């Protein structure tokens, strides 16, 4: 019986749908774990073969058949090491979320996930079934009894307890758990509790990378049999974790182990958004991006994110001044581009705007200017930016934040134009926090202080500020956090100290702008309740409450 078991944990990105490429990479990583790291066991994240979440690809028989062929090929290439690989298994008319144990050229065992999440961003019950006969997977490597669970299984006490009853003392848990604020602390507390309940040691491996609106943070850990959580991998980093499990003490000794000092929430959110932009571009064939730069804080923050994600040479900023654009706005945009080394172009919207006014003039005769003319300016900018991306290639990043998406303070087919929205899940007050944080952590000034300290304005009419139409952002975001993120009622929000008239005004804006959000570009989820797949409200909705 061996004193230790060496485990290689593959915290890498496995793109959705790239079955053949993922299979090739898994085989290469298995060989690397065996030959370079001397591992006895190598584990891969949940559904690593298909990527997570594959969504309705799982309804395509050809996709599932491709996965079956690929897992057999991986098994045939696995020798001198045990590999645990996640994939979607088709069995007749049903599909299971599984992790297979591969050894000596074949599939030795297959564990089927017991707990299928069907809340927030997860809808696994749409695709997967639970094995009616139950599922338990325990195997021995060098005399050590090892169990397997998958992600959500660990959030319930019974699956781990049952696996330990089956003889496991070390449990491997592949995951695909997306990032959100505060999740690390919640997860670590849960892992510690499960280990203390059972005395089992846990190797918790999470996938890393952006997938549309989801960003998986990795941040994998190991937990000893006494419930001590050992951070093992940097968040949002592609890397190996190699540890020796010391059986006599039920603890882990690091071989390849990255320990980070405590990371702030702002730092994690920044990494999530940067990784979201980076991977969305890479996985959809974009090497460069465009940003409409107004001299305001939202577009300035998006520009800094884009530079961190892709590099300054892959980012082009565009000023689009109008008759209402302050000279300070133009100057601040130029200052930021100079500081970051970003190419800056300028296209005045006045000719386009004037042309639209002239074309519509006969129909608008005798009517006072209103939001229509303001929106024409925004749509003029959208047309120009989309034309530049269309002509020269690249992805247009839209610059709206969560506060604006919530209350509709954005122009559909105007400033909402673009393919990805980096700030979609970040409230305006958090935009200011992130801008100040980004400036503190770099010698290069990312966002000019003048941008941060000036009153926010859309500059669509003379002397305009956001607070002409909206409550102060600290009030607005407080109400939105309660209503959107926490699903609190009007009465609860008023009881929290907000004026009834302001609450009614804000809640009505949220309700009547659902149609805009349904047409918004995707953006990285960083909160517990993001707009998109986890907040599915009807557009036609008579409920008030």
UniProtKB/Swiss-Prot annotation:
One of its GO terms (molecular function) is NAD+ synthase activity. The keyword Nucleotide-binding applies. The keyword Nucleotide-binding applies. Its EC number is 6.3.5.1. The active site is at residues 46, 113, 151. GO terms for cellular component: cytoplasm. Keywords: ATP-binding, Ligase, NAD, Nucleotide-binding. Residues 5-247 form the CN hydrolase domain. One of its GO terms (biological process) is NAD biosynthetic process. Residues 269-545 are annotated as: Ligase. InterPro entries: C-N_Hydrolase (IPR003010), C-N_Hydrolase_sf (IPR036526), Gln-dep_NAD_synthase (IPR014445), NAD/GMP_synthase (IPR022310), NAD_synthase (IPR003694), Nitrilase/CN_hydratase_CS (IPR000132), Rossmann-like_a/b/a_fold (IPR014729). L-glutamine binds at residues 119, 177, 183. Pathway: Cofactor biosynthesis; NAD(+) biosynthesis; NAD(+) from deamido-NAD(+) (L-Gln route): step 1/1. Deamido-NAD(+) binds at residues 375, 404, 516. ATP binds at residues 292-299, 399. It catalyses: deamido-NAD(+) + L-glutamine + ATP + H2O = L-glutamate + AMP + diphosphate + NAD(+) + H(+). Catalyzes the ATP-dependent amidation of deamido-NAD to form NAD. Uses L-glutamine as a nitrogen source. In the C-terminal section; belongs to the NAD synthetase family. This is Glutamine-dependent NAD(+) synthetase. It comes from Xylella fastidiosa (strain Temecula1 / ATCC 700964). The gene is nadE.
């Amino acid at each position: 019986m061996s004193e230790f078991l060496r485990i290689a944990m593959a915290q890498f990105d496995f793109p959705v749908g790239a079955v053949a490429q993922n299979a090739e990479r898994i085989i290469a990583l298995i060989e690397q774990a065996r030959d370079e790291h001397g591992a006895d066991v190598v584990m891969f994240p949940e559904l690593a073969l298909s990527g997570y979440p594959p969504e309705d690809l799982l309804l395509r028989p050809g996709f599932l058949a491709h996965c079956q062929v690929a897992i057999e090929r991986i098994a045939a290439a696995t020798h001198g090491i045990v590999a645990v690989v996640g994939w979607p298994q088709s069995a007749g008319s049903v599909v299971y979320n599984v992790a297979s144990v591969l050894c000596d050229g074949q599939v030795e065992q297959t564990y089927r996930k017991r707990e299928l999440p069907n809340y927030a961003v997860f809808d696994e019950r749409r695709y997967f079934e639970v094995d009616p006969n139950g599922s338990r997977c325990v195997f021995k490597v060098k005399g050590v009894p090892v169990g397997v669970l998958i992600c959500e299984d660990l959030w319930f006490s019974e699956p781990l307890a049952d696996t330990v009853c089956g003889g496991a003392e070390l449990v491997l848990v592949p995951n695909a758990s997306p990032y959100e604020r505060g999740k690390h602390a919640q997860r670590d507390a849960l892992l510690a509790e499960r280990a203390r309940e059972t005395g089992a040691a846990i190797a918790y491996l999470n996938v890393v990378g952006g997938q549309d609106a989801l960003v998986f943070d990795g941040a994998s850990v190991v937990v000893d049999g006494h419930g001590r959580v050992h951070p093992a991998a940097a968040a949002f980093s592609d890397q190996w974790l190699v540890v020796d499990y010391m059986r006599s003490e039920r603890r882990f000794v690091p071989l390849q182990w990255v320990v980070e000092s405590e990371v702030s929430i702002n730092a994690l959110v920044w990494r999530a958004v940067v990784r979201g932009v980076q991977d969305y571009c890479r996985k959809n064939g974009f090497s460069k991006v465009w940003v409409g730069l107004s001299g305001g804080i939202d577009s300035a923050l998006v520009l800094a994110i884009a530079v961190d994600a892709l590099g300054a040479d892959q980012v082009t900023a565009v000023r689009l001044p109008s008759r209402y654009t302050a000279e300070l706005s133009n100057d601040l945009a130029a200052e930021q581009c100079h500081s970051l080394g970003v190419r800056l172009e300028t296209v005045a919207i006045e000719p386009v705007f004037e042309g639209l006014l002239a074309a519509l003039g006969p129909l608008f005769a005798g009517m006072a200017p209103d939001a229509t003319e303001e929106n024409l300016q925004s749509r003029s900018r959208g047309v120009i930016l989309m034309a530049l991306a269309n002509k020269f290639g690249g992805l247009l990043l839209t610059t709206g934040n969560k506060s604006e998406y919530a209350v509709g303070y954005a122009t559909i087919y105007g400033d909402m134009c673009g393919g990805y929205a980096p700030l979609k899940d970040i409230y305006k007050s958090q935009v200011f926090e992130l801008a100040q944080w980004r400036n503190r952590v770099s010698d290069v000034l990312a966002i000019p202080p003048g941008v941060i300290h000036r009153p926010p304005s859309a500059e669509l009419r003379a002397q305009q500020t956001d607070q002409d139409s909206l409550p102060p952002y600290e009030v607005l975001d407080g109400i939105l956090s309660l209503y959107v993120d926490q699903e609190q009622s009007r009465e609860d929000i008023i009881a929290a100290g907000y004026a009834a008239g302001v609450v009614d005004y804000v809640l009505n804006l949220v309700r009547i702008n659902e149609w805009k959000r349904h047409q918004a570009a995707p953006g990285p989820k960083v909160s517990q309740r993001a707009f998109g797949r986890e907040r599915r409200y009807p557009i036609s909705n008579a409920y008030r409450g």
